[in-house]
Regions:
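Conserved catalytic or regulatory cores that recognize and/or transform ribose-phosphate-containing ligands
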Residues: 1-78
């Protein structure tokens, strides 16, 4: 039996969204409660370029088993 926890990347808008971290934190808490390992771009440091964020995000997505799309994800710049 495979006891490995599934990893879930949380996709959602950050740039220009006031209090964006609240939605990401709620999603993280929900995923942890369900036994998943969340990967959240909301924990990345501020001040990098969009290209730097994209490289990190793509690596996280590549490492994930699934993606959770938060409301407004389709409007995200990333």
């Amino acid at each position: 039996m495979d006891d490995k926890k599934k990893v879930v990347y949380i996709a959602g808008p950050i740039t220009g969204v006031k209090n964006y971290w609240e939605a990401f934190e709620k999603a993280e808490e929900d995923l942890i409660g369900l036994g998943y390992i969340p990967l959240s771009p909301a924990h990345l440091p501020q001040g990098m370029t969009n290209a730097q964020y994209a490289r990190i995000d793509f690596a996280m997505i590549d490492s994930a088993d699934a993606v959770l799309f938060l409301p407004g994800w389709e409007n995200s710049e990333g």
